[in-house]
């Protein structure tokens, strides 16, 4: 991490900026293959929380969750949300959201927030971390792979309606 980039915990004063970043992420993901279902099923609770008044407060109050912000030259340009999930006898870290504004990609902010989230998962005793990339989203897939992640599952989906992507 260079002096230009930093990672910090979100606070309730960041609610408006978190809402903006969440909305940007939703718009970007929503047009990708599998995006609409992903938004409804996998990220629905986090997105709804960040988009509603008081929602960030609820996420911040949950000790099994972490909301991080990445800054570049003092401006908030990234959001990462993770949670610890009990799986059998151990905990699994789950990255619910990791979004960096397009103008701030490739400068290290995404890696910085990811490293901070993985560091938190390690400290609280998680044995592994899961993150999601949509089919065809090579940028996200490459980002996670370059940071030590490996695919462990592919989810297949068959729409029963012609209108669903």
Place the predicted regions along the sequence by residue.
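Extreme N-terminal starter segment of soluble prokaryotic enzymes
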Residues: 4-7
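Conserved acetyl-CoA-binding loop-helix of GNAT-fold acetyltransferases
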Residues: 97-100, 106-119, 142, 146
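Acetyl-CoA-dependent GNAT
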Residues: 9-13, 20-90, 96, 101, ...
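Residues that form or flank phosphate/diphosphate-binding pockets in enzymes
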Residues: 90, 108, 139
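Conserved GNAT acetyl-CoA-binding A-motif
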Residues: 121-133
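Conserved active-site alpha-helix within GNAT-family acetyltransferase domains
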Residues: 111, 123, 135-153
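Conserved beta-strand-loop-alpha-helix junction that forms the acyl-donor binding cleft
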Residues: 105, 131-140, 157-159
